[in-house]
């Protein structure tokens, strides 16, 4: 199936967080200029037809009450984990549902740490991670990313190791591609 990645959508005036308001700064572009929303992981291409079809089918039911996740939801995750990561024995009861990345991060942080625990996060960092740690009462310990001689962002493994040991850290957040620098981490 081919997808449309070339149509430019004008999302201004449609409650688009990426285009209608630039948070954190209070600054709006001067008249005649546009902002490029590099601060948010929001895609501006047309949604894939199967996604639109599924949403439209769901909207045919005029009630949006609570729903149960279908078997296909769990099967797709189990198959993806098996094929992509070699995970065997994953069961539906091992899979949770989250509405977004930050909800998932919050659930994981609250499941494996306690308020006051220190969490390792690379900086620069996505402000959503910062707010989630603050909201859950965790303490951020930053490990600064370093640029190599080619200008590529790299993790500083010595710094990470030292901070993990010195701060008795048992939980770290890795973001790939890294937000905000866009670096996709290699598998070693």
Regions found by a protein language model. Give the residues of each.
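N-terminal small-domain helix-loop-helix segment of the aminotransferase-like
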Residues: 2-6, 10-100, 107
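Conserved core of the PLP fold type I
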Residues: 64-188
């Amino acid at each position: 199936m081919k997808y449309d990645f070339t149509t430019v959508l004008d999302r201004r005036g449609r409650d688009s967080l990426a285009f209608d308001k630039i948070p954190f700064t209070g600054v709006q572009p001067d008249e005649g200029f546009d902002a490029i929303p590099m601060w948010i992981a929001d895609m501006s291409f047309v949604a894939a037809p199967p996604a639109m079809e599924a949403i439209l089918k769901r909207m045919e039911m005029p009630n949006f009450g609570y729903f149960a996740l279908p078997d296909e939801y769990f099967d797709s995750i189990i198959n993806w984990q098996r094929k992509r990561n070699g995970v065997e024995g994953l069961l539906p009861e091992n899979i949770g549902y989250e509405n977004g990345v930050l909800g998932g991060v919050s659930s994981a942080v609250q499941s494996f740490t306690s308020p006051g625990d220190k969490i390792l996060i690379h900086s620069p960092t996505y402000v959503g991670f910062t707010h989630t740690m603050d909201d859950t009462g965790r303490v951020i310990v930053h490990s600064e990313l370093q640029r190599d001689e080619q200008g590529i962002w790299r993790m500083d493994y010595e710094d990470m190791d030292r901070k993990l040991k010195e701060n008795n850290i048992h939980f770290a957040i890795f973001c790939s591609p890294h937000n905000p620098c866009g670096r996709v981490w290699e598998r070693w």
